[in-house]
């Protein structure tokens, strides 16, 4: 949403961080979906939470299915993954105008949306670095996201370093600074999700770039 459709990796789900208790969040979201907007309504369905081996339960996202309707007719299902507010990542969002979505809405005769809260880039970078550097990580696609996020980030790396140190300490898994090693299936996974644009073309070079990024972040004071 921050970078636009043409400059991001395609994904079919939506990840968000909640600033309230999960029951309060789901109740408020379900109410908003029922109230609707411009003929759109929806239903919220809680799905079974995964229990991946070696991952503490407090770090596992709570999945939901969002089932939108237009004038009472279903037309799509959106997979929603809801995380909790680990180190304040939901407390200080950036607000961005969804220009691509607004262009589509206006072409269809709907009013544009106002600014939407999105996670601050320093938190996104920290979370991606933690996920992609985890032991036995299967998240080669995070290397793509990190390149896009780094291009968009205009702040001082010292802020990113402080956020990374806090997140890695909070999750108590691998230590900061980590080293990204890659995996057996990363080459195919990376190539399959690589969008067009000025990005690194092969996974080995992307891993080297990401480890260099970690070094630059850790050196910032």
Regions inferred by a protein language model and the residue ranges of each:
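Acidic Asp/Glu-based divalent-cation binding sites
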Residues: 15
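Structured mid-to-C-terminal alpha-helical surface segments
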Residues: 2-8, 18-221
């Amino acid at each position: 949403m921050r970078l636009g459709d043409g400059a991001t990796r395609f994904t079919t789900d939506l990840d968000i961080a909640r600033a309230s208790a999960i029951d309060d969040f789901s109740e408020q979201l379900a109410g908003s979906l029922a109230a609707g907007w411009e003929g759109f309504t929806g239903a919220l369905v809680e799905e079974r939470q995964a229990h991946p081996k070696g991952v503490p339960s407090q770090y596992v996202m709570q999945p939901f299915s969002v089932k939108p309707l237009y004038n009472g007719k279903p037309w799509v299902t959106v997979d929603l993954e809801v995380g909790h507010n680990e180190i304040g990542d939901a407390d200080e969002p950036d607000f961005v105008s969804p220009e691509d979505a607004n262009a589509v809405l206006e072409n269809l005769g709907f009013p544009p949306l106002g600014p939407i809260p999105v996670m601050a880039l320093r938190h996104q970078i920290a979370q991606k670095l933690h996920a992609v550097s985890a032991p036995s990580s299967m998240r080669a696609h995070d290397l793509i996201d990190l390149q896009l996020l780094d291009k968009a980030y205009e702040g001082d790396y010292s802020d990113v370093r402080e956020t990374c140190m806090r997140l890695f300490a909070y999750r108590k898994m691998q230590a900061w600074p980590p080293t990204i090693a890659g995996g057996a299936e990363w080459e195919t996974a990376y190539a399959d999700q690589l969008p067009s644009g000025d990005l690194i073309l092969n996974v080995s070079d992307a891993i080297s770039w990401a480890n260099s990024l970690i070094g630059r972040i850790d050196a910032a004071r």
